[in-house]
Amino acid sequence: MQWYRFYCVVHDRIISGEDLKAEDDAAAIRAVRERDTGYDCELWAGDRRVATIPAEGEPIRF
């Protein structure tokens, strides 16, 4: 298990952030999607950006 942090973003400003623990990158992306924040989110593992997860549509993985 690995720790991740995701940030919800509006107009390039962070409006919230939350830690989560997941088995791998794919599981972390699913966990963010399941939260259905209604905002675009960025998922990070330490200083590595894992994905940008739009409010609608498919995640963009890095």
What is each stretch, according to the model?
Residues 9-10, 32, 50:
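Extended aliphatic helical segments
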Residues 1-15:
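Short aromatic-glycine-(Arg/Gly/Cys) micro-motifs in beta-strand/loop hairpins
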Residues 15-17, 50:
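Local beta-strand/beta-hairpin segments that build beta-sheet-rich folds
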Residues 38-62:
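Short, mixed-charge low-complexity intrinsically disordered segments
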Residues 1-4, 36, 59:
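Generic intrinsically disordered, low-complexity segments enriched for polar/acidic and small residues
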